[in-house]
């Protein structure tokens, strides 16, 4: 397997997305935008909670749901869509339409790249990618609704981008072993669910 897929997929690891989400949260609180900061926590937190719950639910079956090819929804895809997507919406909120579209398009390319890498590495099926993407889009939509209600603060975008870039560069390649922990938890919840058969 070409190493480029591992390089791309590492941008979606929780070791990158979660610290980046925390950095954005700090910037929002520092800018005095408490409501948007809370909305950010709700959006990213709900994404993590939902994808975690789905992983446990499907993992409790102990085998692939053959009719939809589902074993474990893609957390990389979900969190990448939520974090990178919401960050793009936040950065673009105070920019001209043309620049906003450019940022959203570039972000979409990154998210799609991460999603494709999960399939290329045989870590997830297309159905698992689609479900992860849907969860991430839901989280980003939640944050977008908050952006429409509360004005985006004048963040120091230069410092945010520098800080985010340094953080991603430092954490890229680090892998937090969340998936095995979720799998073990799923085994504890092994249930005889009708849709597992």
Segments (PLM) and residue ranges:
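N-terminal transmembrane-helix/juxtamembrane module of multi-pass inner/ER membrane proteins
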Residues: 1-20, 51-69, 174-197
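Hydrophobic alpha-helical transmembrane segments
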Residues: 12-29, 79
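Helical transmembrane-bundle signal
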Residues: 24, 48, 52, 111-115
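Interfacial segments of alpha-helical transmembrane regions
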Residues: 26-46
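Short helix-capping/hinge motifs at transmembrane helix termini and TM-loop junctions
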Residues: 31, 58-59, 122
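Membrane-embedded catalytic cores of phosphoryl/pyrophosphoryl-handling enzymes
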Residues: 34, 64-181
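Alpha-helical transmembrane segments in multi-pass membrane proteins
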Residues: 39-47, 51, 55, 132, ...
């Amino acid at each position: 397997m070409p190493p480029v897929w591992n390089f791309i997929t590492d941008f979606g690891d929780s070791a990158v997305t979660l610290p980046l989400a925390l950095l954005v949260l700090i910037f929002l609180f520092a800018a005095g935008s408490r409501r948007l900061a809370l909305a950010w926590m709700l959006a990213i937190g709900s994404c993590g909670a939902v994808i975690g719950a789905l992983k446990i639910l499907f993992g409790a079956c102990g085998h692939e749901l053959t009719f939809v090819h589902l074993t474990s929804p893609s957390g990389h895809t979900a969190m990448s869509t939520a974090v990178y997507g919401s960050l793009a919406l936040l950065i673009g909120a105070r920019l001209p339409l043309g620049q906003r579209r450019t940022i959203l398009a570039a972000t979409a390319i990154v998210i799609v790249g991460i999603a494709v890498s999960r399939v290329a590495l045989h870590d997830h099926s297309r159905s698992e990618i689609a479900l992860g993407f849907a969860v991430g889009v839901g989280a980003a939509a939640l944050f977008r609704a908050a952006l429409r209600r509360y004005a985006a603060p004048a963040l120091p975008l230069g410092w945010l981008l520098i800080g985010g870039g340094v953080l991603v560069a430092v954490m890229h390649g680090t892998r937090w072993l969340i998936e095995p922990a979720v799998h073990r938890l799923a085994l504890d919840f092994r249930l005889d669910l009708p849709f597992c058969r």
